[in-house]
UniProtKB/Swiss-Prot annotation:
Part of the 50S ribosomal subunit. InterPro entries: KOW, Rib_uL2_dom2, Ribosomal_uL24, Ribosomal_uL24_CS, Ribosomal_uL24_KOW, Translation_prot_SH3-like_sf. PROSITE patterns: RIBOSOMAL_L24. The lineage of its organism: Bacteria, Pseudomonadati, Chlorobiota, Chlorobiia, Chlorobiales. Belongs to the universal ribosomal protein uL24 family. One of its GO terms (molecular function) is rRNA binding. SUPFAM superfamilies: Translation proteins SH3-like domain. It comes from the Bacteria. This is Large ribosomal subunit protein uL24.
Length: 80
């Protein structure tokens, strides 16, 4: 009986330049910053920007609203 995580292969890798082919950011290009093969998702630079609320910390004494990239499905991008 095998246990563990199934190895998934994606068509893109970190540092590849990709074109978004579907979704709100369709037509944008960017560099792949991170790949999540198990979830079939990638983070692309400058694509799918969302606002994240951060609690007060030493680096942000009053808290903050930070804009950052969130993952998109790998089927929505292609190499360019």
């Amino acid at each position: 009986m095998k246990t563990g995580i199934k190895q998934v292969k994606l068509h893109v890798r970190k540092n590849d330049t990709v074109l978004v082919i579907a979704g709100n950011d369709k037509g944008k290009t960017g560099k792949v910053l991170r790949v999540f093969p198990q979830k079939n998702r990638v983070i692309v630079e400058g694509v799918n920007i969302r606002k994240r609320h951060v609690r007060p910390t030493q680096s942000h004494p009053q808290g903050a609203i930070i804009e950052r990239e969130f993952p998109i499905h790998a089927s929505n991008v292609k190499k360019s």
